[in-house]
Amino acid sequence: MTVLQTTRKEAGLKGVRIFESVVKAVIWRFAREFRRIASPLSSKRRKPTRANGNAAFPNRIFIAGCARSGTTLTQRLMGCFADTFVHPPEARHAMLNMLDRPESNLVVKRASRSYAHLAKLPASTGLIYCVRHPFDVLTSSHPQTRALRRFHVTAERWLAEYDALLQLKKAQPDRQVLYVRYEDMVGEPDVVQDRIARSFGLAPRIRFSEDPANPIRKTSLRKWERNAEFLTYLSSLPPAFLARVERFCGEFGYDMPANPGDKVANRLAP
Protein backbone atom coordinates (compact mmCIF):
# COMPACT_ATOMS: atom_id res chain seq x y z
CA MET A 1 0.00 0.00 0.00
CA THR A 2 1.41 3.34 -1.00
CA VAL A 3 1.77 6.31 1.31
CA LEU A 4 -0.99 8.11 -0.60
CA GLN A 5 -3.37 5.16 -0.18
CA THR A 6 -2.58 4.95 3.52
CA THR A 7 -3.23 8.66 3.96
CA ARG A 8 -6.56 8.40 2.16
CA LYS A 9 -7.58 5.41 4.26
CA GLU A 10 -6.71 7.23 7.50
CA ALA A 11 -8.59 10.31 6.34
CA GLY A 12 -11.61 8.18 5.52
CA LEU A 13 -11.57 6.50 8.91
CA LYS A 14 -11.24 9.88 10.60
CA GLY A 15 -14.22 11.19 8.65
CA VAL A 16 -16.29 8.17 9.70
CA ARG A 17 -15.39 8.70 13.35
CA ILE A 18 -16.34 12.38 13.15
CA PHE A 19 -19.65 11.50 11.51
CA GLU A 20 -20.38 8.87 14.17
CA SER A 21 -19.61 11.33 16.98
CA VAL A 22 -21.92 13.95 15.46
CA VAL A 23 -24.74 11.41 15.11
CA LYS A 24 -24.27 10.27 18.71
CA ALA A 25 -24.35 13.86 19.95
CA VAL A 26 -27.57 14.59 18.06
CA ILE A 27 -29.21 11.41 19.37
CA TRP A 28 -28.11 12.21 22.93
CA ARG A 29 -29.47 15.74 22.77
CA PHE A 30 -32.76 14.53 21.29
CA ALA A 31 -33.11 11.88 24.01
CA ARG A 32 -32.33 14.41 26.73
CA GLU A 33 -34.94 16.86 25.41
CA PHE A 34 -37.51 14.08 25.07
CA ARG A 35 -36.93 13.00 28.68
CA ARG A 36 -37.21 16.61 29.84
CA ILE A 37 -40.54 17.13 28.10
CA ALA A 38 -41.96 13.72 29.03
CA SER A 39 -40.82 13.84 32.65
CA PRO A 40 -43.67 14.19 35.18
CA LEU A 41 -41.47 16.56 37.19
CA SER A 42 -41.00 18.77 34.15
CA SER A 43 -44.74 18.84 33.53
CA LYS A 44 -45.36 19.66 37.17
CA ARG A 45 -42.88 22.51 37.12
CA ARG A 46 -44.25 23.96 33.93
CA LYS A 47 -47.89 23.77 34.89
CA PRO A 48 -49.13 27.38 34.73
CA THR A 49 -50.97 29.04 37.58
CA ARG A 50 -53.91 29.76 35.31
CA ALA A 51 -55.71 27.63 32.74
CA ASN A 52 -54.21 28.41 29.35
CA GLY A 53 -55.28 25.32 27.48
CA ASN A 54 -52.00 23.41 27.76
CA ALA A 55 -50.23 22.54 31.00
CA ALA A 56 -46.92 22.10 29.14
CA PHE A 57 -46.61 25.80 28.36
CA PRO A 58 -45.72 28.58 30.81
CA ASN A 59 -47.70 31.73 31.38
CA ARG A 60 -45.98 34.36 29.20
CA ILE A 61 -46.38 38.06 30.05
CA PHE A 62 -45.01 40.97 28.03
CA ILE A 63 -44.62 44.48 29.49
CA ALA A 64 -44.94 47.31 26.97
CA GLY A 65 -45.42 51.06 26.99
CA CYS A 66 -43.54 54.24 26.21
CA ALA A 67 -40.27 54.92 27.99
CA ARG A 68 -40.61 56.81 31.31
CA SER A 69 -44.10 55.35 31.80
CA GLY A 70 -43.28 52.89 34.56
CA THR A 71 -42.24 49.87 32.50
CA THR A 72 -39.02 49.36 34.48
CA LEU A 73 -40.79 49.72 37.83
CA THR A 74 -43.45 47.24 36.74
CA GLN A 75 -40.81 44.81 35.49
CA ARG A 76 -38.98 44.86 38.82
CA LEU A 77 -42.13 44.53 40.88
CA MET A 78 -43.24 41.46 38.91
CA GLY A 79 -40.60 39.62 40.88
CA CYS A 80 -42.93 39.97 43.88
CA PHE A 81 -45.06 37.13 42.49
CA ALA A 82 -44.35 33.51 43.35
CA ASP A 83 -43.17 31.01 40.73
CA THR A 84 -42.30 33.87 38.36
CA PHE A 85 -39.14 34.51 36.36
CA VAL A 86 -38.49 38.09 35.24
CA HIS A 87 -36.00 38.34 32.36
CA PRO A 88 -33.61 41.14 33.43
CA PRO A 89 -32.59 42.67 30.06
CA GLU A 90 -35.02 44.45 27.79
CA ALA A 91 -35.99 42.26 24.83
CA ARG A 92 -38.53 41.66 22.09
CA HIS A 93 -41.55 39.53 22.85
CA ALA A 94 -39.94 36.64 20.95
CA MET A 95 -37.62 36.18 23.93
CA LEU A 96 -40.54 34.68 25.85
CA ASN A 97 -40.42 31.65 23.55
CA MET A 98 -36.66 31.24 24.00
CA LEU A 99 -36.59 31.13 27.79
CA ASP A 100 -36.08 27.65 29.23
CA ARG A 101 -37.10 28.10 32.85
CA PRO A 102 -38.81 25.88 35.44
CA GLU A 103 -41.04 28.74 36.66
CA SER A 104 -44.67 28.72 35.58
CA ASN A 105 -44.74 32.45 34.77
CA LEU A 106 -42.29 34.24 32.47
CA VAL A 107 -42.04 38.03 32.19
CA VAL A 108 -40.19 40.12 29.59
CA LYS A 109 -40.05 43.90 29.35
CA ARG A 110 -40.04 45.44 25.88
CA ALA A 111 -36.90 46.75 24.19
CA SER A 112 -36.67 50.39 23.09
CA ARG A 113 -37.99 49.68 19.59
CA SER A 114 -40.37 46.85 20.41
CA TYR A 115 -43.31 49.12 19.64
CA ALA A 116 -42.61 48.51 15.95
CA HIS A 117 -43.60 44.85 16.42
CA LEU A 118 -46.32 45.26 19.03
CA ALA A 119 -49.16 44.50 16.61
CA LYS A 120 -47.60 41.07 16.01
CA LEU A 121 -47.68 40.06 19.66
CA PRO A 122 -48.95 36.44 19.80
CA ALA A 123 -52.49 36.08 21.07
CA SER A 124 -51.27 33.57 23.66
CA THR A 125 -48.98 36.17 25.27
CA GLY A 126 -50.44 38.30 28.03
CA LEU A 127 -49.87 42.05 27.81
CA ILE A 128 -49.33 44.65 30.51
CA TYR A 129 -49.31 48.11 28.93
CA CYS A 130 -47.93 50.92 31.09
CA VAL A 131 -49.21 54.48 30.66
CA ARG A 132 -48.44 57.78 32.36
CA HIS A 133 -49.55 61.37 31.95
CA PRO A 134 -47.92 62.40 28.63
CA PHE A 135 -46.61 65.68 30.07
CA ASP A 136 -44.69 63.76 32.73
CA VAL A 137 -43.31 61.40 30.09
CA LEU A 138 -42.28 64.21 27.76
CA THR A 139 -40.46 66.15 30.50
CA SER A 140 -38.62 63.26 32.11
CA SER A 141 -34.85 62.89 31.77
CA HIS A 142 -32.74 59.72 31.71
CA PRO A 143 -29.06 59.18 32.56
CA GLN A 144 -28.42 57.44 29.23
CA THR A 145 -29.54 60.42 27.13
CA ARG A 146 -28.99 63.36 29.47
CA ALA A 147 -25.82 64.40 27.62
CA LEU A 148 -27.65 64.27 24.28
CA ARG A 149 -30.91 66.07 24.99
CA ARG A 150 -32.83 67.71 27.80
CA PHE A 151 -35.68 65.19 27.87
CA HIS A 152 -35.45 61.47 27.20
CA VAL A 153 -38.65 60.91 25.19
CA THR A 154 -39.05 63.02 22.08
CA ALA A 155 -42.45 63.92 20.67
CA GLU A 156 -41.72 61.61 17.74
CA ARG A 157 -40.99 58.66 20.03
CA TRP A 158 -44.10 59.25 22.12
CA LEU A 159 -46.26 59.44 19.00
CA ALA A 160 -44.72 56.27 17.55
CA GLU A 161 -45.51 54.41 20.77
CA TYR A 162 -49.12 55.60 20.80
CA ASP A 163 -49.60 54.78 17.12
CA ALA A 164 -48.23 51.28 17.77
CA LEU A 165 -50.80 50.77 20.52
CA LEU A 166 -53.60 51.87 18.20
CA GLN A 167 -52.31 49.50 15.51
CA LEU A 168 -52.34 46.64 18.01
CA LYS A 169 -55.94 47.37 18.97
CA LYS A 170 -56.90 47.46 15.30
CA ALA A 171 -55.02 44.26 14.42
CA GLN A 172 -56.24 42.38 17.52
CA PRO A 173 -59.60 43.90 18.51
CA ASP A 174 -60.41 41.03 20.89
CA ARG A 175 -57.12 41.12 22.77
CA GLN A 176 -57.26 41.63 26.51
CA VAL A 177 -54.83 44.35 27.62
CA LEU A 178 -54.12 45.16 31.24
CA TYR A 179 -53.40 48.89 31.36
CA VAL A 180 -51.34 50.00 34.34
CA ARG A 181 -51.25 53.72 35.04
CA TYR A 182 -48.01 54.88 36.59
CA GLU A 183 -49.96 57.15 38.89
CA ASP A 184 -51.95 54.16 40.21
CA MET A 185 -48.82 52.04 40.61
CA VAL A 186 -47.19 54.75 42.71
CA GLY A 187 -50.33 55.75 44.60
CA GLU A 188 -51.87 52.32 45.28
CA PRO A 189 -49.27 49.68 44.43
CA ASP A 190 -51.00 46.83 46.24
CA VAL A 191 -54.28 47.50 44.44
CA VAL A 192 -52.44 47.33 41.12
CA GLN A 193 -50.74 44.12 42.24
CA ASP A 194 -54.14 42.56 42.93
CA ARG A 195 -55.32 43.54 39.45
CA ILE A 196 -52.26 41.94 37.87
CA ALA A 197 -52.69 38.82 40.00
CA ARG A 198 -56.33 38.40 38.96
CA SER A 199 -55.61 39.05 35.31
CA PHE A 200 -52.84 36.46 34.98
CA GLY A 201 -53.58 34.03 37.78
CA LEU A 202 -50.51 34.98 39.82
CA ALA A 203 -49.88 34.45 43.52
CA PRO A 204 -48.22 37.33 45.42
CA ARG A 205 -45.03 36.37 47.25
CA ILE A 206 -44.59 39.82 48.76
CA ARG A 207 -46.67 42.99 48.49
CA PHE A 208 -45.50 45.62 46.02
CA SER A 209 -45.51 48.20 48.80
CA GLU A 210 -43.24 46.02 50.96
CA ASP A 211 -40.56 45.20 48.39
CA PRO A 212 -37.31 46.58 49.89
CA ALA A 213 -35.48 46.36 46.56
CA ASN A 214 -37.93 48.65 44.76
CA PRO A 215 -39.08 51.54 46.96
CA ILE A 216 -41.97 53.46 45.41
CA ARG A 217 -41.72 57.25 45.40
CA LYS A 218 -44.47 59.75 44.65
CA THR A 219 -42.17 62.71 44.01
CA SER A 220 -42.17 62.10 40.24
CA LEU A 221 -45.89 62.82 39.83
CA ARG A 222 -46.98 65.88 37.82
CA LYS A 223 -43.64 67.66 38.10
CA TRP A 224 -44.47 69.55 34.92
CA GLU A 225 -47.12 71.55 36.77
CA ARG A 226 -44.51 72.99 39.13
CA ASN A 227 -41.73 73.74 36.66
CA ALA A 228 -41.83 76.80 34.38
CA GLU A 229 -39.17 75.31 32.07
CA PHE A 230 -41.24 72.18 31.55
CA LEU A 231 -44.40 74.18 30.88
CA THR A 232 -42.60 76.40 28.38
CA TYR A 233 -41.38 73.35 26.50
CA LEU A 234 -44.81 71.73 26.48
CA SER A 235 -46.45 74.91 25.17
CA SER A 236 -43.97 74.94 22.28
CA LEU A 237 -45.10 71.55 20.96
CA PRO A 238 -47.07 71.60 17.67
CA PRO A 239 -50.87 71.89 18.01
CA ALA A 240 -51.37 68.74 15.92
CA PHE A 241 -49.22 66.78 18.32
CA LEU A 242 -50.99 68.22 21.37
CA ALA A 243 -54.28 67.13 19.79
CA ARG A 244 -53.01 63.54 19.80
CA VAL A 245 -51.92 63.96 23.41
CA GLU A 246 -55.40 65.19 24.29
CA ARG A 247 -56.92 62.08 22.72
CA PHE A 248 -54.58 59.89 24.77
CA CYS A 249 -55.49 61.78 27.94
CA GLY A 250 -59.18 61.31 27.28
CA GLU A 251 -58.68 57.59 26.69
CA PHE A 252 -56.79 56.96 29.92
CA GLY A 253 -58.46 59.44 32.25
CA TYR A 254 -55.87 62.21 32.39
CA ASP A 255 -56.64 65.90 32.55
CA MET A 256 -54.95 68.23 30.10
CA PRO A 257 -54.78 72.03 30.23
CA ALA A 258 -56.01 73.73 27.09
CA ASN A 259 -52.76 75.68 26.89
CA PRO A 260 -49.75 74.76 29.05
CA GLY A 261 -48.44 78.26 28.40
CA ASP A 262 -51.23 79.67 30.56
CA LYS A 263 -49.73 77.91 33.56
CA VAL A 264 -46.39 79.52 32.77
CA ALA A 265 -48.00 82.96 32.79
CA ASN A 266 -49.74 82.20 36.07
CA ARG A 267 -46.48 81.10 37.69
CA LEU A 268 -44.63 84.18 36.52
CA ALA A 269 -47.41 86.59 37.49
CA PRO A 270 -46.62 88.80 40.55
Name every feature range the model reports, one short phrase each.
Residues 2-60, 142, 198, 202-270:
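PAPS-dependent sulfotransferases, especially Golgi type II membrane carbohydrate sulfotransferases
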Residues 55-57, 97-104, 121-123:
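Flexible, charged surface loops at secondary-structure boundaries
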Residues 60-62, 104-109, 177-178:
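Residue-level preference for the first positions of well-ordered beta-strands
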Residues 63-75:
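Glycine-rich phosphate-binding P-loop
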Residues 77-78, 196:
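Hydrophobic residues on the short alpha-helix immediately C-terminal to a glycine-rich phosphate/catalytic loop
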Residues 80-114:
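Conserved substrate/cofactor phosphate-moiety recognition/catalytic segment
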Residues 86, 107, 127, 177-179, ...:
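Conserved beta-strand scaffold positions in the cores of enzyme catalytic domains, especially
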Residues 111-207, 221-223:
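PAPS-dependent sulfotransferase catalytic domain
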